[in-house]
């Protein structure tokens, strides 16, 4: 989960693919090597008091974990801010804004996860990652990411943020992602609305990589119609 300071789009890290004659498309990694979590003796019960004290290690005077606190939190748990596990954690906490955790979000989410310290959260990493492999949970995470990442005074995602979030969510699983990314790079689109965002996931799950089963008369957004047309022209040129 990228840490927002001035609501700039998160960086796009880890290379995905390079199309002939076109620039490389890069995406962030799913995970980095994690330091081994210390064993927690005796299956300790969850402590709300301990969880709250843990929260205040990172929160500011406004009782919110902001960008600086988030960076320290990520460092302590051994996860890069742009790692997808941070997005899954934010989803579990039902965090409203990227780069911020309120006290209410922290307590509700960490109580659900039964985590009141760094070691317990590290022991839940495999569970958090497993949510990405569940079709229903992944769809919920994907949809959550739209509102999580957008500026709250805007109804749409700016295109740079959309590209970065799509890279994080679909970059390793959708065969056409690098091509779609290149299409967005050269397109006229400067924002992506919620309907377009939702349909990109459906498109990635149902349309073949060669586009052979794409229904031009289907109820796809114009953005995807234009993408298919653009790609077919490239394939025949």
Curated annotation (Swiss-Prot):
Location of this chain's protein in the cell: Nucleus; Cytoplasm, Cytoskeleton, Spindle
GO CC, alphabetical: cytoplasm; nucleus; spindle
Biological process, per Gene Ontology: DNA damage response; positive regulation of protein neddylation; regulation of cell growth; regulation of protein neddylation
Tissue expr: Highly expressed in testis. Lower levels of expression in skin, thymus, spleen, lymph nodes, lung, brain, heart, skeletal muscles, kidney, liver an ovary.
Recorded consequence of changing residue 195 to A: Does not affect phosphorylarion at Ser-41
Pfam families: Cullin_binding
Keyword Phosphoprotein carried by entry: yes
GO MF assignments: cullin family protein binding
The keyword Magnesium appears for this protein: no
Main location, first listed in the record: nucleus
PTM comment, free text: Phosphorylation at Ser-41 is independent of cullin's interaction. Phosphorylated in response to both TICAM1 and MYD88 dependent Toll-like receptor (TLR) pathway activation. Phosphorylated in response to IL1B stimulation.
Record keywords: Cytoplasm, Cytoskeleton, Nucleus, Phosphoprotein
Modified residues (Phosphoserine): 41
Domain DCUN1: from-to ranges: 46-232
Coiled coil: none
Quaternary context: Part of a complex that contains DCUN1D5, CUL1 and RBX1; this interaction is bridged by CUL1. Interacts (via the DCUN1 domain) with the unneddylated cullins: interacts with CUL1, CUL2, CUL3, CUL4A, CUL4B and CUL5; these interactions promote the cullin neddylation and the identity of the cullin dictates the affinity of the interaction. Interacts (via DCUN1 domain) with UBE2M (N-terminally acetylated form) and probably with UBE2F (N-terminally acetylated form).
Function field: Contributes to the neddylation of all cullins by transferring NEDD8 from N-terminally acetylated NEDD8-conjugating E2s enzyme to different cullin C-terminal domain-RBX complexes which is necessary for the activation of cullin-RING E3 ubiquitin ligases (CRLs). May play a role in DNA damage response and may participate in cell proliferation and anchorage-independent cell growth.
Record comment regarding domains: The DCUN1 domain, also known as PONY domain, mediates the interaction with different cullins. The DCUN1 domain mediates the interaction with the N-terminally acetylated NEDD8-conjugating E2s enzyme leading to the NEDD8 transfer from N-terminally acetylated NEDD8-conjugating E2s enzyme to different cullin C-terminal domain-RBX complexes; the neddylation efficiency correlates with the DCUN1D5-cullin and DCUN1D5-E2 interaction affinities.
Name of this chain's protein: DCN1-like protein 5
Gene designation per UniProt: Dcun1d5
């Amino acid at each position: 989960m990228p840490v927002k300071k001035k609501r700039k789009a998160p960086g796009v890290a880890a290379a995905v693919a390079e199309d002939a004659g076109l620039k490389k498309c890069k995406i962030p990694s799913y995970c980095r090597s994690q330091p081994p979590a210390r064993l927690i003796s005796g299956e300790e019960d969850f402590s709300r008091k301990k969880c709250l004290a843990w929260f205040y290690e990172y929160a500011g005077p406004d009782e919110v974990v902001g960008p600086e606190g988030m960076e320290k939190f990520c460092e302590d748990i051994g996860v890069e801010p742009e790692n997808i596990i941070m997005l899954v954690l934010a989803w579990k906490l039902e965090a409203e804004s990227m780069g911020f955790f309120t006290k209410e979000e922290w307590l509700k989410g960490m109580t659900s996860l039964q985590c009141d310290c760094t070691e317990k959260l590290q022991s839940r990493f495999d569970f958090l990652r497993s949510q990405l492999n569940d079709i229903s949970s992944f769809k919920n995470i994907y949809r959550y990411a739209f509102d999580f990442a957008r500026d709250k005074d805007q109804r749409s995602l700016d295109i740079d943020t959309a590209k970065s979030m799509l890279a994080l969510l679909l970059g390793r699983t959708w065969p056409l992602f690098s091509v779609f990314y290149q299409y967005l790079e050269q397109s006229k689109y400067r924002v992506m609305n919620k309907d377009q965002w939702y349909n990109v996931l459906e498109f990635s799950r149902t349309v073949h990589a060669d586009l052979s089963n794409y229904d031009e008369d289907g109820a796809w957004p114009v953005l995807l119609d234009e993408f298919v047309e653009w790609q077919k022209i490239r394939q025949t040129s």
